[in-house]
């Protein structure tokens, strides 16, 4: 009983911290910064998107750095593709209605200008150490760009960055999504429990899956930024292209449902109770909060993670790297999140879950299981808790 109470207390604390961090003040701050930077850069995400996509695949010949611009981009994308645009989109749609997808795309549009600025500053204020390693990111451009009197803010950012990296979106969210997917595939009824901790049962599928992921991550991370970039350059394009192809199969396979899905998304973005019904409890405020918040979570625009990787890019051109960094938001949210959202809405996967049992990875899995023409080969029978 004490263990269950402790687990509930931990969940309550995490929930309160989450609501505080992803509340309106932070969302408005990051979104307002994106709007301001969009105006200041003259809508760089519109005027130079084509050039940015070209620079993304064409590395600079005589740049200074440790990894290619494409490698730095893939390193940043490896932290966002799979978590925010698969799990996050599904959760946003279930909690905020299909209209959350539209607000997510709006956040991504302005977030592209923020990402451009982050990449620009990463190169402008990076430092080359004696061992030829390049270091940069928010800690450096806060201190060097704003002045030494703001060094305390750079240190504070580093402390919070470590906390988020260890206990937030850096590790826990990813491994939870992977573990849930592995368990639902190999042991959907949780019949083989390895141990119980804080009131939660952990199956052997979860334990073994976690150990495999830990080993793979260790082998990559211990090789430094160069090995991380090399592995990311192979894995990220492969998983992104594969995911896009399968998502397109689902969406195009339900092509007749697309107009109704788009209409539902637009209607529920501005009048969710009229589109979904008053009983759902979804309001325009909730749709905006979940959509914009999950959008920022998905592409990490303004969170300061991408410029750390961008600082190691082989380039002398600040504008060029800013444009390359900007494409991360375009790929992550504008392309992949849109396809994820459409695949969920056209298949109606979000309707199989109630707010109290929302688990994003299961919702997206259901869309794939029921939406793919060969779903019989991929489908695993859901447990009763999956269909509540």
Question: Can you name each region flagged by the protein language model?
Answer:
Residues 2-83, 93-100, 111:
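N-terminal alpha-helical transmembrane segments of multi-pass membrane transport
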Residues 22-27, 59-68, 98-99, 147-155, ...:
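Membrane-interfacial loop-to-helix junctions in multi-pass transporters
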Residues 29-36, 40-53, 175-182, 204-266:
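Membrane-interface loop-to-helix entry segments
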Residues 38, 118-126, 130, 246-264, ...:
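Extracellular/periplasmic helix-exit of transmembrane alpha-helices
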Residues 43-69, 91-93, 97-101, 113-148, ...:
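Flexible loop linkers connecting adjacent transmembrane helices
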Residues 63-95, 121-145, 156-159, 163, ...:
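Alpha-helical membrane segments and immediately flanking helix-loop junctions
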Residues 110-118, 210-225, 236-256, 289, ...:
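Selective recognition of specific alpha-helical transmembrane segments in multi-pass small-molecule
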Residues 379-388:
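Single conserved hydrophobic/aromatic residue that forms the stacking wall/gate
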